[in-house]
């Protein structure tokens, strides 16, 4: 996420290139305004981009409905990351970031 000085798609040593939607960028901007722990978020994104499994505390799981094919993990109890790992093209796609009510209502 080059604008935020932490990640560049296809950075050296990462298994997956990081891509993100315009909505994710807006969600991240809002999270910064809300003083969310973005260091924790970037650590999770880095693990995902490296192909590492997330610890159980992140409650990583598959989604259904509108987000079928995607996964969700908890950065904080009510702060979620919706993403997809596209193994065929080696891409980590970041779709949304927000609370349960922001994402699913």
Regions found by a protein language model. Give the residues of each.
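Basic, Lys/Arg-enriched alpha-helical interface segments
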Residues: 1-77, 86-92, 97, 101-105
């Amino acid at each position: 996420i080059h604008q935020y000085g932490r990640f560049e798609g296809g950075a050296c040593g990462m298994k997956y290139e990081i891509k993100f939607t315009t909505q994710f960028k807006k969600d991240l901007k809002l999270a910064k305004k809300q003083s969310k722990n973005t260091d924790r978020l970037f650590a999770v994104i880095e693990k995902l981009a490296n192909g590492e499994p997330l610890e159980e505390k992140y409650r990583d799981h598959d989604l259904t409905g509108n987000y079928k094919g995607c996964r969700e993990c908890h950065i904080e109890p009510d702060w979620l990351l919706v993403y997809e790992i596209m193994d065929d093209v080696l891409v980590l796609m970041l779709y949304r970031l927000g609370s349960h009510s922001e994402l699913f209502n």
